[in-house]
UniProtKB/Swiss-Prot annotation:
One GO BP: S-adenosylmethionine biosynthetic process
Organism of derivation: Caenorhabditis elegans
Remaining remarks: Protein expression is regulated by post-transcriptional regulation: under rich-diet conditions, mett-10 binds and methylates sams-3 mRNA, directly inhibiting splicing and protein production of S-adenosylmethionine synthase.
Keyword annotations from UniProtKB, A to Z: ATP-binding, Magnesium, Metal-binding, Nucleotide-binding, One-carbon metabolism, Potassium, Transferase
Official protein name in the record: Probable S-adenosylmethionine synthase 3
Lineage summary: Eukaryota, Metazoa, Ecdysozoa, Nematoda, Chromadorea
Pfam family, one: S-AdoMet_synt_C
Chain positions recorded as K(+) binding sites: E45
Residue stretches spanning the membrane: none
Pathway: Amino-acid biosynthesis; S-adenosyl-L-methionine biosynthesis; S-adenosyl-L-methionine from L-methionine: step 1/1
Function summary: Catalyzes the formation of S-adenosylmethionine from methionine and ATP. The reaction comprises two steps that are both catalyzed by the same enzyme: formation of S-adenosylmethionine (AdoMet) and triphosphate, and subsequent hydrolysis of the triphosphate.
Amino acid sequence: MSQHKFLFTSESVSEGHPDKMCDQISDAVLDAHLAQDPHAKVACETVTKTGMIMLCGEITSKAVVDYQVLVRNVIKKIGYDDSSKGFDYKTCNVLVALEQQSPEIAAGVHVDKDSDDVGAGDQGIMFGYATDETEEAMPLTLLLSHKLNRKLHELRRSGELEWVRPDSKTQVTIEYASEGGACVPLRVHTVVISTQHSPDISLDDLRKELIEKVIKAVIPANLIDDKTIYHLNPCGSFIIGGPMGDAGLTGRKIIVDTYGGWGAHGGGAFSGKDPTKVDRSAAYAARWVAKSLVKSGLCRRCLVQVSYAIGVAKPLSVMVFSFGTSALNEGELLKIVNDNFDLRPGMIIKDLDLKKPIYEPTAENGHFGHNEFPWEQPRHLQIDVELLKKIGGKTISNGNGIAH
């Protein structure tokens, strides 16, 4: 099999990054409404700068939510509890500019419609991606970037790295081999970590601790060699962080939220949107489809696209692409998708149980690759006899299964 090598890079940002703060606040608002009113229609954007949070958007809900308390609790959880860290939940100003959902949108999307036939909340294109390079069916570049951030802030919370502050970014470059369209990680080429820190640690000590306590704890030793490059706080000191260093806005980390630059992206953000917004629910469903195909052994990589028109329930188009890693052609894979998945928004919401208040955790370390989310549970696929014959009648060894 022909093979060539290439480098690919993905990044992640921490829960204390200003944009991620806004994502978490927007999703906390969504969860607060869904907890009281599962039919709430929410489109909540958050913006932050020094000492200020602003909520803006459209919400139609029976819920009663104390936004002042909610916002401050999210900021406190993240760890911004003193102005020296760039933000303080106790003293920040919380502004609220929320209005009702447009009655024209409501009439076209959900009013007087059966729950199964709810129309798409907007037009748009959404993508799902999966790859067999990791158990999570996620790109290793992004998975490691997320894990580096998560480990860094576990150590911050435990007090083991008490000099770490909430704002950080990570980036991982991996050398891959391409094998017939599949991607095989060979080694970690470069690791970048930039973390906010207290003034009382030297850069030398900071870099040593990042290598010993974060990088070595996260990245498998067999992927690191003497040629691996480290850029640890390469700009020098990073004391001024959070919203004091940069403004934040919901929906500005859509590649971090999804596949780290792999696959494709339709442009729509997730956070702060209830599941009638197909930007969110259809992207989750597309991931569910792609992961189900990969975990069933039908292909090693998979990209799924769906598209919608506002107020129309049925997708305008569905596309499946296997990068040449399947014994089946794209038309045959599409038949399997159509036979096993109903991609109308109402059915996505029902099948994935998306009216529950589950969204704030999605805004922390990526929306995909975490098994606690329902769209990460592969569907047991029903495949007709003729297609089973073409793939040799095999059932997949990982236990997710093909039925006939």
